[in-house]
């Protein structure tokens, strides 16, 4: 694969290009998955690992004390401070009109703050169209927003969409999962990739264990289930090593409990995974 920088310079998606540029600038292909249940835990962990990641993945609906002002706004401030994209792991799976409102409206208003989200392919192309509509409507409403908040961020060029960037959001399709017994394999994975081709501007890539072979599109591949120590858990999660997933075409490794579970030091572990991910990338691209 070409380098992150080379891909960013020619990428069809302005959003994907910004992600690749940030990865290259920070020298980190690590996404921290912060599956915690309180705002305090989420914000504290995000602040600790923020300098070492390109992205933070959330499950915002498991936050017991969620409020938009108390949870989302501090998280957005940390994204600007440390330079990372926000990825709400919502796994949308309904018809187009429903997912549009799940994405844009309700308590969480995901489209307002989450740079990237994901969806199952089961409902067909309607789910992509619905989420795109939610993104376009939200971004259109935000065009009038004051961007002065970004002025003091050294990561402004990566995090702030250009004026002509119509979507300013990205969607990942769930092509493969890391849990034991997953049905997202084989023909299902192939059909999901075909669905993504219906809108390569908005669908920027996949949650997958491998890069699609022989595909001419430059998809972003994000891989969960990455661990340097553990092999799995009692609930079916299976872990692969950093070098293993990078060798099969991953762009960004997703690590959760490996950073903060079992009384681990999240700062030291984030540094460790950042180093491992970047070294594995350099081995492939040197």
UniProtKB/Swiss-Prot annotation:
Gene Ontology terms: cellular component: cytosol
Residues reported in the UniProt entry to bind substrate: 35, 57-59, 89-98, 239, 257
Active site: 91 (proton donor)
Pathway of action: Pyrimidine metabolism; UMP biosynthesis via de novo pathway; UMP from orotate: step 2/2
UniProt-recorded Gene Ontology molecular function terms: orotidine-5'-phosphate decarboxylase activity
Keywords: Decarboxylase, Lyase, Pyrimidine biosynthesis
Family label: Belongs to the OMP decarboxylase family.
This protein's name: Orotidine 5'-phosphate decarboxylase
